[in-house]
Amino acid sequence: QELYMYQDDPLGVSYQALNQALYPDHPLGVDILGTEESIKATTYEDLRLAYDTFYHPSNMNLIVVGNFDPQALLAVIEANQARKTFEPPRYHRVEEEVTAPVLPKTQLEREISQPIIELAWRFAPENLSGLELIRQRIIGEVFFELLMGPMSSAYASWYQQQWVDTNFYQSYHLDHKMHHLAIHAQSHHTSDLIAAI
């Protein structure tokens, strides 16, 4: 039922089409919900492996922000984790390079009240990790927020011309293999908005 609800959501479908266009022939472009057939074929063991993999400490990061003593907090965390035991990870990470070019244009036909626009630019992957990855991600997010976020002059101009409404947003993604900017909008002025962006 959740799969059908997702497939009936125009925004979710358009976002998945965007990922498929950005990362064709790559796991990043594959719908994580799967298909009706793959869902029916999923076993308890599959779900257990997915859960154990996702929530395994070797696959997690802890980011803490605030006014605290870092050493005292680290001592609390280490004491908490020392009481726990974890099996070695039961998975082998397979990383595929993103090699296929971005698909230039995808168009979906649906009966909706307002056209949906998904624009995206895929950037070269960055070989970053740890604090440098977080730092560069924040820099990108702030930059694009200043450039076209709701407080920017560009957004104000587009909003005044009724090219965008409150459904306009941009999202910057920087991770191990994923690096792109995506712009999402609902507009009856698609050509004007695309030209302005």
Positions of predicted regions on the chain:
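Charge-rich, well-structured scaffold segments of protease-associated domains
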Residues: 1-90, 123, 135, 144, ...
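His/Glu-based metal-binding/catalytic segments typifying zinc-dependent metallopeptidases
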Residues: 87-153
